[in-house]
Amino acid sequence: MGTNPLPRIKSYVKKVGSRNFLAIDFASYMGKTMTDIKPLLYNLNNLGLITYNSAKGTIAVNGRMYRWLGARSGRMDHDVIQFISEPERGVKYNASLSLLNYDLSMEGVNSIVLSNAQGTKVFPDQGKLILKENRSFTFKGVILAGRTEIYGDEFSFDYDKFRLNLIETNWLRFFVKRKEKHTDGDLVRKLQSQLIGARGYIDIDDAKNKSGKNEKKHQYPILKCVKKTFVFYDNKNIHDGAYDREKFYFEVEPFEMDSLDNFETSGMRFDGKLISASIFPDLKETLVVQDDYSLGFIKQAPEEGISLYLGKANYENEISLSNKGLMGSGDIDYLSSHAESSAITFLPNSLSAIADL
């Protein structure tokens, strides 16, 4: 019909003083015939903006139309969420509705953008999700929130709170800014350490700023881990997997991290303790990003040294942890012997060192 008809409907409601009126009267107001206006009425009815009863010839304007107008004008908040179902060949349906709880099980939903402004989207595993009341849903798969990626077996999205609940995660990893210039122009790279077993939630944006138009909300998305998480160093590339995750791991305390889309690498700090398979006593430390893009730390042993291998030796000097392993350099006193080395590798059942002559 050329111009947007919604403002005209709003004006007509104001004129007649009611959201309920005859379709033929509205057609006359628009200077149209019923034949002209029927396709529009059916379309608006399908969108849920009005309820058009063709048998009775009546129109009822729904509240959704006013929310739609408010969102388009910028006066009201809105979201960008769309559920696009494109099932693989052989799948007979896009969705099935449970008559017990009205959950809608959807197929072929490969991705859902939750916030363009905050760079947050989800990728349901095998394109499957369960849509619940008021656009909330559950799924398994991958969450991408800014420069944070999470894979898990159970997530839920709470529309009212605009929050992703991390119920059962497998791993969480970050993409950090490169320290060096890169020829392909890639400004970020994947952190080489993962946080395992994260439980908590991600607040995508302020619940009243689902559109992301209020750009003053710089702190979002916000990740809050409410349980302890773990960093392991048992990759086969690290001394042939010598650091068994059952005995050697870093236990990260619950933490909160904001600005997941634009955080600084220097701000990534995870307090906790290293359990080192009895190489050292438990070490309270803070994980930060190391030069090899893994999470680790560098610390100085106390002046009197630190017990090594359950008191069999004493170590003095630097201790470092990264994907290079648990390393050191300095003095080692073992029984009645003394040695100095600038390259020590501490392993659960042994150490290797290049002695300084």
Task: Give, region by region, the residue ranges found by the protein language model.
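Structural signature for solvent-exposed beta-strand/loop edge elements and short helix-capping sites
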Residues: 1-357
